[in-house]
């Protein structure tokens, strides 16, 4: 964000800037989402909602995972929040005591280590290479597991490498004796092969998902955390104490995205892929 702010100053001074610092779509939010949010505001959807999020939205997320991945969830497993970042922070607050470790891919999203440290934990980096797709391999992860290790964070499709873990790779990682935290915010933007969720292979993982990337809704700040039922109430309690709930009308926009914007997502995905292919020529 600091780099972007400096770039904005240079742009205002007349410099021609190409932004490579943020994973932000350059498409507008789908019209159906904007229209639904206008209607929600006109109807007075400006109150608190349940801290887990609107049940209708959570049920639609359940439907989305069943349709896309064949995964069966309960609405109570889903915590809707104002973006995935605060939800990840709450998750680390639940998992970590001072000095506990979280295993992180390196390279990886620059904010991951800060979230771990803020919760009192120690970020332990797993060095990855181009040969393994810049993704952690089970053998390397196992070497780093110790009595203070509280989880492995994976990101597929990944930031910054863009690499994707295969179904078999996810299946193997799911067998590790530590919780898997899967950041799936870039799901919907895969260009080759099949897209899989860690939830296809284990019911004990934590999954971060949202609307920012695939639906071009970065500024709306809407995401969700899927957790095992045994952890859902604790996460809900943390959320209602620190954040209360996500914005009511924004949640209704997210509902419209899931119900009416899949064609927009596919159109944007095809255009991203076209740009990618042009860049690689």
What are these regions (language model features)?
Residues 94-116:
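Conserved PLP-anchoring active-site segment centered on the Schiff-base-forming lysine
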Residues 201-273, 277:
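Conserved core segment of the aminotransferase class I/II
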Residues 1-83, 90, 257-260, 277-278:
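N-terminal small-domain helix-loop-helix segment of the aminotransferase-like
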Residues 100, 121, 176-179, 203:
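A short helix->loop->beta-strand "cap" motif at the edges of active sites that frequently abuts
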Residues 124, 128-193:
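Active-site phosphate-binding strand-loop segment of PLP-dependent enzymes
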Residues 118-124:
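A short helix-loop-beta submotif of the ANL/AMP-binding
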Residues 72-78, 98-101, 148, 203-204:
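Short acidic capping loops at alpha-helix termini that bridge into adjacent secondary structure
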